[in-house]
Amino acid sequence: MAVIDIGLQQVAVERFAVRNAFTISRGAKTFVDVVMCVVTDGIFIGRGEGTPIYYHGETAEGCAAAIEALVQAQGGVPDRETLRTLMPPGAARNALDCALWDLEAARTGKPVWALAGLKAPQPVRTAYTISLDTPEKMAQAAADARARGFTLLKCKLTGDGDQARIEAVRQGAPDVDLIVDANESWADLDVQAQARALADLGVALIEQPLPAQADAALAGLALPVPICADESCQSLDDLARLGAYQAINIKLDKAGGLTEALAMAHAARAAGKRIMVGCMLASSLGIAPAFLLAQFADWVDLDGALLLAHDREGAMNVASGYLSPGTLWGEAIITDAQRS
């Protein structure tokens, strides 16, 4: 078993307030708890952040405990590939995996994009999420987002009254590109009829219309809008059964880290799938690793830190709807003393 000379310096639960309530079909959130870990070789450190997948029953406290238990059992922090065999996909593994990438960048003096064999990242257009609300409030939120420079909006839907919501959003921001996320809420609806109505309003992508266990109901449907798997696509093992979907949403917290997410992206391309890179509510430390995947994604939805009331220092930057990396993760050689 490959255990390298890396220890766990810190694991902590941190809370970030959400600027406005973040509402989807499953409820509203006014804050998010994340798990943040720091790994070290005694000279350099690496940091990673994970947001628990609450619909899987994860909690930040549980993730922190899982990280501590793994490191104690192994006598140190295992390397990334070994970590994939020891810990299931989820926020805990994501935090550790990304911390290991960050540490390697510091130790080698090479940015993570170079270590991963990628090109230097460029700014990417990110979607901005319009929370589920009344048509009037969603229209105003869309107009506000457009005034801030966002040209790609992602609207949260719930099944009942969705067409009226998108019609209102179109009035509020007539020139934006639109994608929608049903968060599994269309179980009692005619998916084809819903998709046709939204296609007429210029919707370019529909995320997760049905519950994950109902994927078979999508098979054979001729839809005018591509369908993207989110809750149905957690990790690499899920790809083989997603024939009814034209796209997948890769989130590092679902996949369990950048290592798995990169493997998923390559496998998805080989299978002819289009790629969305998404995120949970998170600080820029949690978003930064996904920025590398965004470089070759068809849709980018990395607004998780933009929805917070306050972010970390060195946060990612956004201008005219385009996201640029900050200085939090994966770039410079930073010693323990420099970062403390």
PLM features per residue range, with description:
Residues M1-A2, V277:
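N-terminal short leaders/motifs
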Residues A2-L178, N183-Q192, R196-D200, R312-S340:
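N-terminal capping/lid subdomain adjacent to the active-site entrance of alpha/beta enzymes
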Residues C155, D160-Q295, A309-G321:
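Catalytic core of soluble alpha/beta enzymes
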Residues D298-D301:
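Short helix/strand-capping turn motifs
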Residues A305:
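Active-site cofactor/co-catalyst pockets and adjacent glycine-rich loops in catalytic enzymes
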